[in-house]
């Protein structure tokens, strides 16, 4: 049966969560108008004035979609509390995960290094989501203790945690893999992987994560395949995935806590911008993946399901969110792009 309108009442009732700064009266009027977006088949029946209003609403709707503000919520995290590590700015996947978690009914605490909080936009996100911001260096156990203690003061035990932390000085300095600076390599490991172990160890000792809770860390397929330019970050991601399995067994056995990693498509982020050839890799992955690249919004949605009770028996897994890229060998689009490039080189 065809729909008369593009959005139903139930689909727009979730919008107030995304617009807490707008007065209730204006917001209710906006939601009412949004319900009047017609299905395409009804467009010819609309009057001229109504069409003008609809046109404005389509522009607003496009803006919301572009900003990742959805008109659908399932309350998957209603009543749940969480900690998001690693949000820096709107380019961060962790930023979008934080927004989606709140849209789905959760209360959260945001954390990043003091420098990142000062130089980035985390305080703005905290204000928008009504979330406390706790500066902390995830490589230091005492500062991690402060984060979890603050969360427990605010919420009691937390239900979910996101680890979205990664940085390689060798990549930033343009060092080749066969010419690494080993002090910088250790820094890569400490920030990108060992911080995950420290986070889990501190949480377990404090008994900070509730029974049946969920921990997710973000990773990349370079942990298992060779990608030129990803450098020592590939080694760090391999370690990260191993920690998820090893700690997943212990935390699951003792406390029923789930630990998984999400292997995300190449995504434009502040951290990823330092990887040589990133834009070409994005194009290649888009051509190779049958569903195309998964973007930050897709990753956030996947993380939400892993935080929810719907995935209560999933743990110690490395889960690909990449449009099918990880299972592909070659696609017609990739072959065509390669052939075109070769033909251009031979001219």
Could you say what each language-model-derived stretch is?
Residues 127-128, 274-289, 338-346:
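A short C-terminal helix-loop "cap" of Rossmann-like NAD(P)-dependent dehydrogenase/epimerase domains
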Residues 84, 162, 216, 259-262, ...:
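Hydrophobic structural elements of the Rossmann-like NAD(P)H-binding subdomain
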Residues 86-93, 166-254, 263-269, 292, ...:
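Catalytic loop of short-chain dehydrogenase/reductase
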Residues 194, 261, 279-314, 319-323, ...:
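C-terminal helical subdomain
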Residues 123-127, 134-145, 149-153, 160-188, ...:
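Conserved mid-core segment of classical short-chain dehydrogenase/reductases
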Residues 106-122:
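Conserved glycine-rich Rossmann-like NAD(P)H-binding loop of the short-chain dehydrogenase/reductase
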């Amino acid at each position: 049966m065809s729909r008369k309108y593009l959005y139903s009442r139930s689909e727009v009732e979730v919008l107030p969560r995304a617009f807490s700064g707008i007065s209730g009266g204006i917001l209710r009027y906006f939601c009412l108008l949004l319900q009047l977006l017609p299905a395409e088949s009804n467009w010819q029946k609309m009057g001229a004035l109504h069409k003008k209003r609809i046109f404005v609403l389509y522009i607003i709707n496009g803006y919301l979609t572009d900003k990742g503000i959805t008109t659908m919520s399932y309350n998957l995290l209603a009543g749940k509390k969480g900690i998001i590590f690693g949000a820096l700015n709107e380019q961060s996947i962790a930023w979008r995960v934080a927004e989606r978690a709140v849209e789905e009914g959760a209360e959260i605490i945001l954390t990043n290094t003091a420098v990142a909080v000062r130089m980035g936009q985390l305080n703005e996100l905290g204000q928008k989501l009504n979330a406390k911001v706790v500066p902390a260096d995830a490589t230091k156990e005492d500062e991690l203790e402060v984060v979890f203690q603050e969360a427990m003061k605010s919420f009691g035990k937390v239900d979910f945690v996101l680890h979205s932390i990664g940085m390689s000085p060798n990549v930033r300095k343009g060092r080749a893999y066969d010419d690494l600076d080993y002090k910088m390599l250790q820094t890569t490991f400490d920030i990108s992987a060992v911080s995950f172990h420290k986070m889990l160890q501190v949480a377990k000792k404090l008994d900070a994560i509730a029974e049946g809770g969920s921990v997710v860390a973000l990773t990349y397929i370079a942990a298992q395949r060779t990608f030129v330019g990803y450098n020592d970050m590939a080694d760090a991601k391999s370690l990260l995935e191993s920690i998820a399995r090893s700690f997943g067994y212990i935390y699951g056995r003792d406390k029923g806590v789930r630990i998984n990693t999400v292997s995300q498509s190449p995504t434009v982020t502040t951290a990823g911008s330092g990887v040589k050839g990133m834009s070409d890799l994005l194009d290649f992955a888009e051509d190779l993946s049958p569903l195309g690249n998964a973007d930050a919004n897709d990753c956030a949605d996947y993380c939400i399901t892993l935080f929810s009770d719907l995935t209560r028996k999933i743990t110690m897994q490395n889960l690909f969110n990449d449009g099918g890229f990880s299972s592909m060998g070659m696609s017609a689009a990739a072959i065509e792009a390669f052939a075109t490039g070769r033909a251009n080189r031979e001219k």
